[in-house]
């Protein structure tokens, strides 16, 4: 089975930077172990990408915390994932969900798609919904143990919402 594993926004600013959380830091070793096991999966990473004008954008006005400003350190994918990034497609995205992501994944002819990453309640759920719409007949799942939300409550709420939309939560 051709499985695509989508790794959402595992970037320094979401781990221990401007928007970092203990949950994200705690999840990272589980994600590394998963990637070490998933040797047959085709990897696609997303990378939240903002410019110096972030605070002037719609997102910046609603979340006035500069983060993932290219090419600052906070924008970089976590160092522990660098060996996996070398084997992956990387999609930079200027907002929560990526309309480019389904185009990249379509070229991989997926038979299953699994998502992991940060933040469950923002970018993971946004991309899960986009992928569900783009690939209605492809099983889509989320590994909850390799995700973290802004808060534990919002993480759980996002998982419940994805389940309601027929995204399998494991």
PLM feature segments, named:
Residues 114-118, 138-150, 170:
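A short glycine-rich beta-strand->turn/loop micro-motif centered on a GG-aromatic cluster
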Residues 50-52, 74, 96-99, 147-149:
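Short, catalytically relevant binding-site loops at active-site mouths
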Residues 18, 55-57, 101-103, 126-128, ...:
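Short, well-ordered secondary-structure micro-motifs
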Residues 1-90, 156, 160-163:
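Active-site acidic carboxylates
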Residues 147-159:
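Structured adenosyl-cofactor binding patch, chiefly the S-adenosyl-L-methionine
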Residues 71-122:
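Internal catalytic-core helix/loop-beta-alpha segment
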Residues 32-36, 125-135:
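Histidine-anchored nucleotide/phosphate-binding helix
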Residues 4, 42-44, 112-114, 139-141:
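A structural signal for isolated positions on well-ordered beta-strands in alpha/beta enzyme cores
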């Amino acid at each position: 089975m051709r499985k695509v594993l989508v790794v959402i926004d595992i970037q320094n600013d979401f781990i221990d930077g401007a928007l970092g959380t203990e949950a994200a830091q705690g999840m990272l070793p589980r994600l590394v172990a998963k990637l070490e096991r998933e040797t047959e999966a085709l990897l696609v990473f997303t990378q939240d990408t903002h410019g110096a004008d972030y605070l002037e954008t719609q997102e910046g006005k609603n979340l006035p915390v500069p983060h993932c400003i290219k090419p600052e350190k906070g924008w970089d994918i976590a160092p522990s994932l660098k060996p996996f990034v070398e084997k992956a497609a990387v999609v930079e995205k200027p907002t929560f969900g990526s309309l480019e992501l389904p185009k990249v994944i379509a070229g991989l002819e997926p038979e299953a798609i699994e998502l992991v990453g940060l933040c469950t309640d923002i970018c993971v759920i946004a991309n899960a919904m986009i992928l569900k719409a783009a690939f209605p007949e492809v099983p889509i799942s989320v590994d909850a143990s390799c995700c973290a939300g802004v808060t534990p409550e919002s993480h759980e709420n996002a998982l419940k919402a994805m389940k309601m939309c027929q995204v399998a939560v494991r």
